[in-house]
Structure formats: structure tokens, C-alpha cells
Regions:
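N-terminal glycine-rich dinucleotide-binding loop that anchors FAD/FMN and/or NAD(P) in oxidoreductases
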Residues: 67
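Electrostatic cytochrome c docking/interface patches
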Residues: 18-34, 48
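The canonical Cys-X-X-Cys-His
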Residues: 34-43, 105
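Stable alpha-helical elements in mature extracytoplasmic
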Residues: 29-33, 70, 74, 101-102
């Protein structure tokens, strides 16, 4: 009986710990987004900032944009930046971010869909 209670308590504690870690990771991604991406893409991902409108950034809340969103291309763009056909920088490189931070940002963009 004591063993069964101990197992149940351990399982419940593990579930809460996992939920806490996931929540902390989501908070970290939001902070990384706010610090590095929101100036152009907006806190809400709609791209309706002065720079976002000037650069014509995509509305990440749009289902059509989400449907065409490619995680591998987004990862590459975050790491390497993006230039137009005239070699003008449209988005600077964020290669200083870790692979985990970039993966979390891509997941954050996915979470913006309406």
C-alpha cells in the first residue's frame, strides 16, 4: 500500500515538473521573440509594426501563412538572415542564438496561428 502511494506521488510530481519545464520554455521563447523579433514582426506576429510594414513581413497569425511556413527554412533564415535580390538585408542574422532558442522561436511562430 505504501509503495503504491509512493509511486502515485512520484508520478504526480513528475507531471507537475514536466508542465513547469514546458511553461518555462514557452516563457523563454516569448522573451526571445520580444527581444529579437517583435520590432519587425510585432509581439502578436501580425507584422503591423513600422518596420514590419516597410519590409512587408508576413502575418504569422494568417492560416495561409502558417500552412506555407517551413520550419527548416525559418531556422535557416533565423541563423543566416535574409537578403533581397539586390543583396539588401531584409532580416539580420540571429546566429548568436542557440539551436534550442531557434527551435523554440520556430515553435513560437507556430503557436501564433489563429
Amino acid at each position: 500500500m505504501k509503495t503504491q502511494a509512493l509511486v502515485k506521488t512520484t508520478v504526480v510530481a513528475a507531471l507537475f515538473a514536466g508542465a513547469f519545464c514546458w511553461s518555462a520554455a514557452a516563457d523563454d521563447a516569448t522573451q526571445t521573440w520580444d527581444k529579437n523579433c517583435a520590432a519587425c514582426h510585432g509581439k502578436d506576429g501580425k507584422g503591423q509594426t513600422m518596420m514590419g510594414r516597410k519590409l512587408g513581413v508576413k502575418d504569422f497569425t494568417d492560416p495561409k501563412v502558417q500552412a506555407s511556413f517551413d520550419d527548416a527554412l525559418a531556422t535557416k533564415t533565423i541563423k543566416e538572415g535574409k537578403k533581397d535580390k539586390d543583396d539588401k538585408t531584409l532580416m539580420k542574422s540571429f546566429g548568436m542564438l542557440s539551436d534550442d532558442e531557434i527551435k523554440a522561436l520556430v515553435a513560437h511562430v507556430r503557436s501564433l496561428k489563429t
